[in-house]
């Protein structure tokens, strides 16, 4: 009898092991199988939601075939407790495992409402937009100046809405003073700012931030980004460059950034200043003279006066030979790369051509002819 019981128990164990193996294999297959939904969808996870409520809701949306299997997958991958509040874009035909990964990894919002804070040389704008998962495009719903006395109610209400993404966009050529002042005005950030960052040390870029992030942490990210860009560019520099230090590269890049807004011209403008440095010629660049007058705290908004061109400041490159003592703005990555890897030319001069670009010249005679040509056209 004991042998019979042992035999039955052994048979049952084999059956259970076989059943579990088949069940695990079937479950894994279901978790990895493509979803049946043919269009991407934006799913919002509320703060405090658990895997049970989320799986039930996803099943109602027909994004998953079984909430039970979904929960098993989340438990098996040890992600049941890692749900992140926010809005997440679920691509068409995503498997259950892919969905689990999307709504638990990192917690970075990928769809829904987005607030853009655009900091430019002369403006600070808030743009609110919604992402349409079906078209893959954004629809702008709000656009206003953050300095306005009265903010739109629809913008104020966003502070109580979960899953809203916030992004700060810094344009190239904005001074540190202006960036810091704009960061102080950002009502979705917290904390104080104790100092103005060194000119040139903040990387123009796009930064996603969380609501309530500290201002100091955002500024630190900008500084770290610029340090990273500069150090990598310095390592790949043209070894024939007359620039002796990364700081000198940053100074020249800032001048290039203010002299041209055309990406295709950066290398040419860089070549002019590089050639002038090699020939021990004064740089004679207006933006540096202007910085000596404004320190980046305002836009001059007019041409330089003759008296200003002879005013003795460290930034007057019509009087002083060599680079100014500091950067004159925060240059972008392309300007930094251009400063360290300029085009190979013999150009020593350039003048604005009246259409956003410049006319370049190898000698003073040609340059003067270009100046007269564009002056006559602009009369």
Could you tell me what each predicted segment is?
Residues 243-245, 249, 263-322, 326:
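Small-residue-rich helix-loop
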Residues 304-313, 337-347:
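Short glycine/proline-rich, acidic loop/turn segments that cap or connect secondary-structure elements
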Residues 350:
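Acidic beta-strand-to-loop metal/phosphate-binding motif
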